[in-house]
Amino acid sequence: MDGARVSDEEVARRVATLKRLKALLQEQREKFAQYLVVLQQQQVAIEAQDAETVLRHVELEEALLGDVQRVQKALAPMEQLCLQQASGVQELAQLRCDLSRVQEQVYAQNEKNRALLRAQVSDLRQQLDEFRAARGLVSYEDGEDSGTVIDLSL
């Protein structure tokens, strides 16, 4: 292969690599978009204090995170390969930008949901404390001489 010219085989390989990277970036963006929708629905469930719906959303969230991690494992080496080839970087810049934007939205929504959950847990703890017997209250038996043994013999 001549240094100035790239063989047809090399061009085909680079094109295939770029297409695969583009497909992976699009898939990753779609997974994050789905994740964002789940987080937004989860926020509504948290605000409505619907524990069952929150649980279902957590299960969906875990499945989507598994998908995101799976795609990321394939995406990282493909990006490295494309950077080594130094071709098509400009073509994929918009996809990377879109992916970054959706990731930032996901992180922000996730943090918002965490704050809501922390507030609800705090409220629940306060409610539990209110249900518990108040400290300092005295039993009706305290301070009086009352029997501690009962004679059951006849």
Swiss-Prot record:
Record keywords, A-Z: Coiled coil
GO biological process: bacterial-type flagellum assembly
Domain of life: Bacteria
Annotated coiled-coil segments of the chain: 8-48, 89-138
Descriptive protein name: Uncharacterized protein TP_0942
Organism of this sequence: Treponema pallidum (strain Nichols)
